[in-house]
């Protein structure tokens, strides 16, 4: 099987990028760039963690790094947003967080803030207790980054954890955790919790049309799954 994708609407129809399936990895394709470098493309980017998968995945992560992945799930933030978080971005009195650096671009080892609308929303008290313990034990100051690690290192950690938990590592990227966060909130909202779709869109930094386009149907989760999702998310929005 060979998939062909046009590189540009302005190029001749005969000039196409050819994607070929990666042996033994269903749904993963590879191509060769003009500079000879190989790259991979997933046919389905809408892969969400099921709650049991998420819990098993966390068991395969180094204990000191679990809080990083919990932060990705609790905030639904992009990896760049989460890696720019500092203790001072949290308000412990009401268990809320402000994502200040919402868009950034790295070039030649330098990170440049591009702007974007800041987002301020609540997270669970259970998560906040674990995060505050992490901050105390690491003696992290209010103006220091919570997670002193590169995006590439986190990505590799994710891949290793996913593979160790028995899942297909090529089906997951860091962005899939963000997708999971939004999908889980959509799932509990469908279940009857007083959680407006506009609130979910605000958390994710999406408009309504983008949210509808990029998130699937909550019907993929069973009632048991939804109960576990509520348990994992904690008392965010008084879900429990």
Give the residues covered by each predicted segment.
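Basic, Lys/Arg- and aromatic-enriched nucleic-acid-binding interface segment
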Residues: 49-79, 189
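DNA breakage-rejoining catalytic core of tyrosine-based enzymes
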Residues: 25-54, 108-125, 140-141
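Catalytic-site neighborhood detector that most strongly recognizes the C-terminal catalytic loop/helix
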Residues: 105, 204-229
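C-terminal secondary-structure termini that scaffold catalytic or DNA-interacting sites
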Residues: 1-35, 40-41, 224, 228-240
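Major-groove DNA-contacting interfaces characterized by cationic-aromatic clusters
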Residues: 38, 125-157, 163
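Conserved tyrosine-mediated DNA breakage-rejoining catalytic core shared by Y-recombinases
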Residues: 84-130
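Short, basic (Lys/Arg/His-rich) helix/loop patches that form interaction surfaces
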Residues: 140-144, 156-202
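Short, polar N-cap/turn motifs at the start of nucleic acid-interacting alpha helices
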Residues: 90-92, 191-216
């Amino acid at each position: 099987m060979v998939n062909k994708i046009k590189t540009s609407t302005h190029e001749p129809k005969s000039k196409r990028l050819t994607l070929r399936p990666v042996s033994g990895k269903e749904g993963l394709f590879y191509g060769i760039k003009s500079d000879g470098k190989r790259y991979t493309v997933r046919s389905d980017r809408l892969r969400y963690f099921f709650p049991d998968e998420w819990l098993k995945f966390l068991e395969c992560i180094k204990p000191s790094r679990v809080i990083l992945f919990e932060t990705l799930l609790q905030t639904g933030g992009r990896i760049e947003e989460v890696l720019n978080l500092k203790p001072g971005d949290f308000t412990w009195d009401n268990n809320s967080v402000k994502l200040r650096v919402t868009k950034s671009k790295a070039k030649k080892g330098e990170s440049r803030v591009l702007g974007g609308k800041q987002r301020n929303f609540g997270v669970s008290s259970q998560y906040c207790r674990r995060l505050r313990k992490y901050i105390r034990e690491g003696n992290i100051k209010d103006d220091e980054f919570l997670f002193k690690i590169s995006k590439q290192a986190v990505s590799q950690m994710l891949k290793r954890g996913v593979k160790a938990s028995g899942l297909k590592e090529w089906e997951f990227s860091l962005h899939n955790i963000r997708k999971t966060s939004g999908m889980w909130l959509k799932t509990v909202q469908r279940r009857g919790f007083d959680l407006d779709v506009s609130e979910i869109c605000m958390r994710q930094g999406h408009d309504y049309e983008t949210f509808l386009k990029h998130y699937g149907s909550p019907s993929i989760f069973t009632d048991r799954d939804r109960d576990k999702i509520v348990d994992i998310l904690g008392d965010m929005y008084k879900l429990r």
